[in-house]
């Protein structure tokens, strides 16, 4: 992105530490033979080369994230990822068909949203890409919660947001920037809805809340790097005070939930690196933290 990335963009490159998951010793590690399969519906009456480029960039980014995801977490079943024309900007997971649908209109909407605040097509495409990947991982969380019957507490939509952000900021390529782009999309959407009646009954938190929840986790992960979020007034000091604890607690919770579903290939790689017995290596892997 260019120098006009906005007040919540990362000032530094993402950390490259590997995401691994710990769980209970004695659990059987999952076999990651399940796949994500992609399908693309043809767009009808589509015009606009800029939106087409944005959709292509976002599609490529989703493919990259899927490859990284498969190294870390086993899928409960094959999941079909469908890029489709839906008639409105949306994304969703269908628990009956095990399909994640990303609507072209949603990607277009992200591009148009960021076009109003960012200069240059590269910056706009990168922001739309980040927001798309962020919401895609949100839908992946729904699939994992469904398939592995994860005993989450609280609202599932909030838990899905947490999973998306935590996965991105813990070693995913360009993960910090993508998480912050997702946060910024919530902020911009909230601004567009200013003056409208809020739907407090919706399963999702309000866009303003999703914005602050996301940047709180980003800040809590690396407060020294993102201290500027407090300086420029983006993150209120009273909320920032709780963010490190929030990150640690939620990070540990997702480690516990997903530990038994650590991808087997990731386990094998770690086991070879330890140069010890398989059982000892397995215990070491399961103790490894997200950090």
What function would you assign to each model-found segment?
Residues 129-134, 156-158, 180:
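Alpha-helical scaffolds flanking conserved acidic
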Residues 125-145:
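Short alpha-helix carrying the canonical HExxH Zn2+-binding catalytic motif
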Residues 169-221:
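Active-site/pore-lining binding-face segments in mid-to-C-terminal subdomains
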Residues 13, 17-39, 198-291:
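Pan-zinc metallopeptidase signature
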Residues 153-172:
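An active-site-proximal "capping" alpha-helix that borders the catalytic cofactor pocket
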